[in-house]
UniProtKB/Swiss-Prot annotation:
Residue ranges annotated as Extracellular topological domain: 37-101, 154-162, 213-215, 263-279, 331-373, 424-427, 495-868
Annotated localization: Cell membrane
One BP term from GO: protein glycosylation
Its EC number(s): 2.4.99.21
Annotated region described as Interacts with target acceptor peptide in protein substrate, given as residue ranges: 550-552
UniProt remark on domains: Despite low primary sequence conservation between eukaryotic catalytic subunits and bacterial and archaeal single subunit OSTs (ssOST), structural comparison revealed several common motifs at spatially equivalent positions, like the DXD motif 1 on the external loop 1 and the DXD motif 2 on the external loop 2 involved in binding of the metal ion cofactor and the carboxamide group of the acceptor asparagine, the conserved Glu residue of the TIXE/SVSE motif on the external loop 5 involved in catalysis, as well as the WWDYG and the DK/MI motifs in the globular domain that define the binding pocket for the +2 Ser/Thr of the acceptor sequon.
Protein name: Dolichyl-phosphooligosaccharide-protein glycotransferase 3
DXD motif 1, short sequence motif: residues: 45-47
Length: 868
């Protein structure tokens, strides 16, 4: 019994760590299981699919991997900034489990981020223990397991991205660096050069190296550690630090990290902060040299050099400041590109223009209206944000009293992470560790002051005096920190994201039914040369074509369809209209087909993929990228729908025109300009009004309208509209926007009421497929003479999709000099499942003629004479 009690006293923390790990497994693996292992093995988000692509290619070519990918950002190709750590970790795991492609490989990869999230309790424990104590460390390890928000979402089953490993290795680097410092401080050089002592900074160097190999911009840990040293030297009279051993630990750490990075340092032509280039190597080596210079300054200080030259105690801090200024100045003079790259890191906290439409880039504490909010703080950290802030303030107060170097270092890190968080909400997954560590400090102090630790000690045999009232209060505070945080995490962990079935089915169809599938599948697994520049189109070994969609979907198109997307989630291929740059934004927001054709011709577009999100919510992002700034996108939007107290549904140009006490539908209705864009004509109008684009595939309906279809006739416009209005009003009562399928219906309703007569393209008020694929074709050219009094010619045909939905294709052209010319994209004998089920009806005045178009005529742009 005594042995068991003794063991528990010594290793009690292990039981808490095991409990934390089990809770983490529940949140990260068990909760989202059914959303990942479903109709396929569904990886989350976008970037995990690109890792899947890289890992599949690496397994095929092991141990070689690609550093340039001509399969994306077509036709130029992209340099690959996804680091080797996760690529090789996933490849080795796939090889070990004989899962080298497809669903079996994705099943293995799905567990990697969750494992990283579970293991994160260890570096958080280490870091907290080295700065505070074991009790706070155990609490921090428990808290990091239940932090909700970005950290949870990026360490959940299926989300195989490097983000969890960024956070993991950054905290590991800080923890092992401070561990090395704590083990070295107070010892002479001969003792610290022993194998056991040297192991500490070597391990720290390995963790920094792995951090950079997980994320190319991970070199930022070097200036953070140098900042630790800078303040330790500048505040030498205040901070209690063993500066000599601190400098030596840094020298060894940076040297080892440079060696770890060295094999991957030359995979990009030039310097870059994100691609694997010599830049990171120079930062790490330069940091080692700077640390060595700090060591030399401290040696001079020890022998009284600064006193002898008349500088006194201010000499050493002054020397450090001068050295820092000289180094920065030399960088700007000798290598301005290097310095510019270094300073570019600062821009991550000041996103502008289109970048502000990226969800993970938007400033953390502000709404899109510019209002300050703490909503994100609650969603991403639960109660731990507030406990963490209290912990930071307490730590700052305690530092002023104790003057501890590790505590100062941790505060510098916390401040740096807070600044990053302020600028971009994506850095919430970094700040999670800050909130856990400092919440643990705050709770540990509370537990100590309120006798909870005494009560726990009494439970295993101690006889401490305590106040049960205090203990109860401590438990209440613990509950306030833990319970709401866990409840949030539990609610957020049930869904892992990723492509829905409509998207997956559409891209699987594309892979199997668009030209040259075998060539693309073979080329997908090859190694590619890395060009010196990607400013010019890549030289492909066979005739290729591009697929244009919004950048969110580029990785899915590449990984699932094995086709070449023009835009991708690296924000490549987006383009703009203000500088006339061909790309996805300039294509989809094009206000006429001729401009869209200019873009498509430049980028060799063959297929267009649109979804209901691009048609509705994501259109705003496309407009901002195209126009260059948030306010400039407003021209695509008009007024609002409302439900009045008298029970009528109305439209108002502004909120000021809405009757008092009305329910405002939280949905901006598009302006006339929107309805003239390519995105509207493709998805909303099903291609009506277009000459060179035809639908070839339609996915199933959005989920909500698929469920409505059991009670509503989707061909009955009145029933569809009433259902949409009812849903919109019911959701508006709670301030919630209509579902996307309903937004489409309301967009169509607004068009019929406001703009249809002027624009002349009839639209049926009905939902349609979530994803649509269009083919760009030359089109059959039908031309002929008309009567003298005819000013326009209209064409229509009924089209039936693979979902058995029918719609009317319409096009109207002007008559010039008694002659009309219309280009028709659909053929009646197409191999694609979407095709006309009636002849084209061509009408000029009172004359109507029918015509059947053949696939060869559409593909070759043949001219057909038909006088009216």
């Amino acid at each position: 019994m005594q042995n068991a009690e003794s063991w528990f006293k010594k290793y009690w923390h292990l039981s808490v760590l095991v409990i934390a790990a089990l809770i983490s497994v529940k949140l990260r693996i068990l909760n989202p299981w059914n959303s990942v292992f479903t109709w396929t093995v569904r990886l989350g988000g976008n970037d995990p699919w690109y890792y899947y692509r890289l890992i599949e290619n690496t397994i095929h070519n092991f141990p070689h991997r690609i550093w340039f990918d001509p399969f994306t950002y077509y036709p130029y190709g992209s340099y690959t900034h996804f680091g080797p750590f996760l690529v090789y970790l996933g490849s080795i795991a796939g090889i070990i489990f004989s899962a080298t492609s497809g669903e079996s490989l994705r099943a293995v990869l799905a567990f990697i981020p969750a494992i990283g999230g579970v293991l994160a309790i260890l570096p958080v424990y280490l870091l907290t223990r080295e700065v505070f104590d074991k009790r706070a460390a155990v609490i921090a390890a428990f808290l990091i397991a239940i932090v909700p928000g970005q950290f949870l979402q990026r360490s959940i089953l299926g989300f195989n991205d490097h983000h969890i490993w960024e956070a993991f290795w950054q905290v590991s680097a800080l923890g092992t660096f401070l561990l090395a410092y704590n083990r070295w401080k107070g010892h002479d050089l001969s003792h610290n050069l022993t194998a056991r002592q040297m192991a500490y900074p070597v391990i720290a160097g390995i963790t920094i190296g792995l951090y950079v190999l997980s994320w190319g911009a991970g070199f930022i840990i070097a200036p953070i550690i140098l900042a630790f040293m800078f303040f330790a030297f500048v505040l030498a009279g205040f901070v209690n630090a063993d500066r000599k051993n601190l400098s030596l630990v840094a020298v060894v750490t940076f040297a080892v990290s440079a060696l770890i990075y060295l094999p991957f340092a030359f995979n990009y032509p030039g310097f870059s902060t994100i691609f694997y280039s010599p830049f990171q190597l120079l930062v790490l080596l330069g940091s080692a040299v700077i640390a060595a210079a700090f060591y030399q300054i401290e040696k001079w200080n020890d022998v009284g050099f600064f006193e002898r030259v008349g500088l006194g105690r201010k000499g050493m801090p002054l020397a450090v400041i001068v050295l820092t200024a000289l180094i920065m100045g030399l960088f700007f003079v000798i290598s301005p590109d290097f310095a510019r790259n270094l300073l570019s890191v600062v821009r991550v906290v000041q996103p502008k223009g289109g970048a502000l439409t990226i969800a993970e880039v938007y400033p953390f504490f502000f709404t899109h209206n510019g209002e300050f909010t703490l909503t994100n703080a609650v969603l991403h950290f639960g109660a731990l944000f507030f406990f963490g802030m209290a912990g930071i303030l307490y730590s700052a107060y305690r530092f002023l009293k104790r003057r501890s170097f590790p505590e100062m270092a941790l505060l510098i890190w916390a401040i740096a992470m807070f600044i990053a968080l302020w600028g971009q909400n994506r850095f919430a997954y970094y700040f999670a560790a800050v909130s856990a560590v400092y919440s643990a400090l705050a709770l540990s102090v509370v537990f100590d002051k309120l006798h909870l630790y005494r009560a726990l000690e009494n439970a295993i045999g101690a006889r401490n005096k305590l106040s049960y009232f205090r203990v109860a209060f401590a438990l209440l505070i613990a509950l306030a920190a833990i319970y709401p945080t866990y409840i949030l995490a539990d609610a957020q962990s049930s869904y892992a994201g990723g492509p829905n079935k409509q998207w997956y089915d559409a891209l699987t169809w594309m892979r199997e039914n668009t030209p040259d599938g075998e060539k693309y599948d073979e080329y997908y697994l090859q190694l590619y040369p890395t060009p010196q520049s990607n400013k010019e189109p890549f030289s492909y070994p066979f005739e290729t074509y591009g697929v244009i969609s919004w950048w969110d979907y580029g990785h899915w198109i590449e990984a699932v369809a094995h086709r070449m997307p023009i835009a991708n989630p690296f924000q490549a291929g987006i383009g703009n209209k203000y500088n006339n740059v061909p790309g996805a934004s300039s294509f989809f927001t094009a206000e006429n087909e001729s401009y869209a054709e200019f873009v498509a011709e430049k980028l060799n577009v063959k297929y267009v993929v649109s979804d209901i999100e691009m048609e509705t919510g994501k259109y705003y992002a496309m407009a901002v990228w195209a126009e260059g700034d948030l306010p400039l996108a407003e021209k695509y939007y008009g007024g609002y729908f409302y439900y009045s107290p008298t029970g009528t549904f109305g439209y108002a140009n502004s909120q000021w025109d809405i009757p008092l006490n009305s329910i405002i539908i939280p949905l901006r209705i598009p302006s006339e300009l929107y309805y003239s864009t390519m995105e509207a004509k493709l998805h909303l109008f099903d291609g009506s009004g277009l000459s060179h684009y035809r639908m070839i595939y339609e996915s199933d309906y959005p989920a909500e309208w698929k469920s409505y279809s059991s009670q509503v006739n989707l061909n009955n416009e009145s029933q569809v509209l009433q259902t949409a209005l009812y849903e919109a009003v019911m959701r508006a009562r709670y301030g919630v926007s209509p579902t996307m399928g309903t937004q489409e219906v309301l967009y169509k309703y607004a068009y019929t009421q406001l703009y249809e007569k002027k624009m002349g393209i009839p639209v049926k008020i009905a939902p349609s497929g979530y994803v649509k694929i269009f083919e760009r074709v030359k089109g059959a050219v039908v031309t002929g003479k008309v009567s003298a009094n005819v000013t326009e010619v209209s064409v229509n045909a009924t089209i039936k999709t693979n979902q058995n939905r029918t719609f009317e294709y319409w096009q109207t052209v002007e008559v010039k000099n008694g002659t009309y010319t219309v280009v028709l994209p659909y053929s009646h004998n197409s191999d694609y499942p979407v095709k006309p089920i009636t002849p084209y009806h061509i009408k000029a005045g009172n004359v109507v003629k029918e015509i059947t178009i053949y696939e060869s005529q559409v593909q070759n742009g043949e001219i057909i004479q038909l006088d009216l």
